[in-house]
Amino acid sequence: MIKDIPQEKVTNVAIAVVQEGEDWNVYLVNLKDTPLENVLVSSKGYITHENGSQTKTSELRHALGNVPPKSYAKIEPIIENVFGLHNQYWVTYFSDNQLLDKKYIFLAETIKEENFVKIPILNKRGVMIL
């Protein structure tokens, strides 16, 4: 039964973490030629330490509404204290009447200047997962 459901892959949708002055912000970037409709994003941070203990943040949910083609939407501010955690963003949206979702994970200690790239559409530098 599940094999009968088409498994479309998410393409041309990115999550970017950008430093803006003293602040850091997380953005959803729509590189597609079509809008993303009813966008929902779930975000959380987590890590399991060598001794087995876990550190977790609260899970936050964001309703971004529609994101036009070739544009972006701010998801949330992020603080440097959580860069030592894996930061997960689970994006769900409709595109061409199809429900799509993708999980983006910034691994611990990867949000740093040496990993910066130019973020398309946003025209700023930051860390991006496509």
Regions flagged by a language model, labelled:
Residues 23, 36-38, 88:
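Exposed beta-strand and adjacent loop surfaces of beta-rich binding modules
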Residues 1-21, 31, 103, 109-110, ...:
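Low-complexity, acidic Ser/Thr/Pro/Gly-rich terminal tails and inter-domain linkers that flank the onset
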Residues 49-86, 96-97:
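Intrinsically disordered, low-complexity Pro/Gly/Ser/Thr-rich segments with frequent PxxP/GP/PP motifs
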Residues 33-50:
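Short acidic, flexible loop segments centered on an aromatic residue
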